């Protein structure tokens, strides 16, 4: 069953550009992963500090592989000091 994830990143004030760049650079190699069905990045219109990554994976195993790949590990190490809340990743299944 396909897995859809929503990752929420709340940038520290003044780190918006760095978070944006890190996210945009991270989604490029993720799109090439065999289990990735699609991945997009979003920036909130109402809160300039808030970013999202929406992704779809072939299944949960594909997402687990993604989470362990070097480019994902590097991205998390890069973005973690730039955000002021713990990273929130919701794993969901489509219901309609």
Which role fits each region the language model picked out?
Residues 1-3, 18, 34-36:
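Short, flexible segments with low predicted structural confidence
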Residues 2-9, 40-67, 88:
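Short, well-ordered beta-strand segments in beta-rich or mixed alpha/beta enzyme
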Residues 11-16:
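Short, surface-exposed ligand-recognition loops at beta-strand->loop->(often short) alpha-helix junctions
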Residues 21-37, 56-89:
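An amphipathic, aromatic/His-enriched active-site/gating alpha helix that lines ligand/cofactor pockets
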Residues 91-96:
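Short hydrophobic/aromatic patches at helix-to-coil boundaries
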């Amino acid at each position: 069953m396909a897995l859809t994830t929503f990752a929420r990143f709340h940038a520290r004030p003044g780190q918006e550009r760095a978070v944006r760049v890190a996210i945009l650079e991270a989604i490029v190699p993720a799109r090439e992963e065999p289990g990735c069905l699609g991945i997009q990045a979003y920036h909130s219109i109402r809160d300039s500090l808030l970013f999202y990554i929406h992704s779809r994976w072939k299944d949960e195993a594909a997402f687990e592989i993604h989470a362990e790949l070097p480019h994902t590990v590097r991205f998390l190490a890069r973005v973690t000091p730039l955000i002021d809340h713990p990273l929130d990743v919701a794993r969901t299944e489509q219901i309609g």
